[in-house]
Amino acid sequence: MGKFSDIVKSDTPTLVDFYATWCGPCKMMSPVLDRLKDEMGSQVRVLKIDVDKNPDVSDKFKIRGVPTFILFKKGEIVWRQSGGMDINTLKNKIKQAL
């Protein structure tokens, strides 16, 4: 949990994708997140957390459905949403946090 805390405390916005390997919508979001990383580069950090392998982190943030996205900046949650979404929604939320 220490490394996770260090990452989300960064000045760079960090988008955390809480997902599961068995989740269909999570699989559909993978190429969207890859494209987001390509298009936004160093403006954002994307971190994927497998809820089944990391139940402690999932419990801490009360993850009840996947995918759930939480955007952190300087350790604070600035946005949170569950379910699949398009790249423009993600980009807009990240730009608001810059």
Label for each model-derived stretch:
Residues M1-P13, P55:
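A short beta-strand-turn-helix
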Residues D11-T12, Y19-W22, G65:
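Short pre-active-site segment immediately N-terminal to redox-active cysteine/selenocysteine motifs
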Residues L15-V16, V46, F69:
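Hydrophobic beta-strand anchors of alpha/beta hydrolase catalytic cores
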Residues C23-C26, F69:
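The canonical Cys-X-X-Cys-His
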Residues K27-M40:
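Typically the conserved alpha-helix immediately C-terminal to a functionally engaged Cys/Sec
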Residues L33, P67-V78:
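A short, hydrophobic beta-strand/beta-hairpin element that forms part of a small beta-sheet core
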Residues V51-V57:
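Structural microenvironment flanking redox-active thiols in thiol-disulfide oxidoreductases
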Residues K73-L98:
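Non-catalytic, surface beta->alpha helical segment in thiol-disulfide oxidoreductase systems
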